[in-house]
Amino acid sequence: MLSRRSALLAGAALPLASGAFAPPAQAQQSSVLRIAMTVADIPATDGAPDQGTEGIRFMGYTVYDPLIMWDLSSATAPAKLVPGLATKWYQQPTDPTRWVFELRQGVKFHDGSTFNADAVIFNLDRCLDEKSAAFDRVGRNVLIAALWPIVGYKKIDEYKVELQTKGVDTVMPSLLNRFTLASPANFEKVGKDWQAYRKSPSGTGPWKVKSWTPRERAELERNTDYWNKDRIPKTERMVLLPVPDVSTRSAALLSGRVDWIEAPAPDSLDKLRAGGCKIETNVIPHMWPYTLSLQPGAPTADIRVRKALNLAVDRDAMVKLLNGLAAPAVGCVPTDHPWFGNPSFKIKYDPAEAKKLLAEAGYGLQKRLKMKIAISTAGSGQMYPLIMNEFIQQQFAEVGVDLEFQVLDWNALLNLMRAGSKSPEGLQLNAINVSWNTMDPHNAFMRFIDSQQIPPKGSNWGYINDPEFDKLATEARNTSDPKDLDKVLARINTRMVDEAVFVWFVHDVWPNAISGKVKGYVHPKSWYVDFSPVTVG
């Protein structure tokens, strides 16, 4: 069972969230979009948004821009990468480890300063140069996932920079969609202090931060001078509210205190529809697994245990529990994806086989396997973690596995993930329940299986250190033809499933419940969304 602390954490957001619903000033005189997020705090406002991918959705792609961004204009076609603050990028013909990025001209930060090559170098220094006055260890921990392949960089001219990778790496540019750029002039203005910058942020994005109060609300206003005139927001203001409790979010929408909620309560869908709300879903690149510790001596270092855990859960029943707000997962990507491959280990619900494998590993109903898992109360892509983990706990118990949960705030769980399974805290755990995006090759696979990504360098929390996986990761980075790359990635997913390095459960369909007053919304096949075309009223 979930601990009493879990229940307290789940309910702790209620009074806070309720207080945050006060209507914004002059709400009747201007168009305002009010959104209840699943996170427990306002994502960092300084261009290095925390709170996972939801942080990027609400405080990254709104206030800031990356060099390369996603086209989020379609609900039917997969999102694709397009030019952002960089208009063109290519490898040097004489040295494919060097990438040239030609930068967009005529772009201004919200403080009025000019975006140029110096701004790019400043943001790289922030993460990669510990001797720089701009260096920010907190921001680095967030942004390094986009920058880790880069071993060198330089300014070529006012609107051109060069990035160098350790080896040939054709995947690197796709990572830069998460590298949002802050203003060097504003950093100077606030006294070269990132804490002060967060109080007075400045990006180049379609929205400006008007005000924000930690753990309560942030108010954004549209940037009428945005460089892409087609993406100047149609709504004047957007209010972001951290509301991690799922029931509180649904109640807020039904009562008209917000216009949009992330992840409505599964049992509230009929009531929300009856109240005139729309339930928006779409297939997005996402997986919701247990990331397993492969530390020597851990029970999950035994492949028989790992396979048994994958066979112990009825995924169709979990989807039914969530009222259809999920899709079963038997690998990092859906089975019809070109990256899925052809694993020999077929993940299905087979409790008898799970018991057999556990018995071979020395466990059983009379000698139960005890495991400790770190989970969150809510968070970006975490869906309904308390409900879902209780379901898994019950199913595992039926095959002789007893789960104990360490329940954390989402940001605390992310910090635990970044520390790795070999950290003092990680050694007390058998797995972590962190949802992952699978939007690009690195995020879908390579950050988990590449030994170069063992913390603190990356997200290989379980400490997978396997020559075959390393070889496949290198091959993927050296492959430029998209169809050939698909084949390499399919081999990676095949090996991940055959080795059962995760316990896969479901893929999210990113449900949003939206007031009937909201128009113009496109629900893309992505973790991100373009709020610019949305209107209210």
Placement of each model-derived feature along the sequence:
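N-terminal secretory signal peptides and thylakoid transit peptides that target proteins
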Residues: M1-L14
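Extracytoplasmic/periplasmic ligand-capture domains
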Residues: L2-S3, Q28-Q29, A40, L72-S73, ...
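C-terminal segment of N-terminal export signals and the immediately downstream linker at the start
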Residues: F21-T38
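N-terminal lobe/hinge region of extracytoplasmic solute-binding protein
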Residues: M37-T94, S202-G203
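Short, solvent-exposed loop/turn elements at domain surfaces
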Residues: I42-A48, A75-P78, V171-S174, A218-E219, ...
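Surface-exposed binding/hinge segments that line
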Residues: E102, I121, R137-F187
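Mature extracytoplasmic/periplasmic domains
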Residues: P184-A185, G324-S344, P511-G516
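Long beta-strand-rich cores associated with HINT superfamily self-processing modules
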Residues: N512-G537
